[in-house]
Amino acid sequence: MHFRSAETAGRSRRGIVPSESMSRAKPKPAAPKPEALRGDHSKVVIVDGSNVAFSSEGERGVLKNIVTIRDRLVAEGFEPIVVVDAALRHKIDDEVGYERLVDEGVIKQAPAGTDADYFILSFADELNASVVSNDRFKDRIKQYPALRKRLIKYMIVQGEVVFEKRTGRRE
């Protein structure tokens, strides 16, 4: 799906679209209701990419951590959505690789000046998805109480991912 900016609205690939052709256009069908857009998201997992990047020791985030977690989830049959803070682009060990993954849509970067946690938890709530993160989200748990049952902790040991075994019990 492509979006046009306000600057390019009203233009076709060949130039300006005549205004009369716009007035003769067939009315668009009503947008589907949000429920219709939901579909089956049972395999969607939201990944706290900034948390994952900084799970290794050091002052810079490690892009390989994000890729390792994502690849493991894909191999397990899940559809990971990796969300990161905008500031991560300046704190990652492989800036070129990071920008490539953002451009490809593998990594979703929260808008600058916003808290990625809001987007992570909102997506998880909207899609009824689990969240891979070692963050406890203590400041948001009252707003998103279902998070207690959906939060999946992890470790990366010698390049291998170990996810917390879920027992269904959570305090």
PLM features per residue range, with description:
Residues S42-V47, V52-L63, V67-E171:
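Nuclease catalytic cores that cleave nucleic-acid phosphodiester bonds
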Residues F3-S42:
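Acidic, polar low-complexity linker/tail segments
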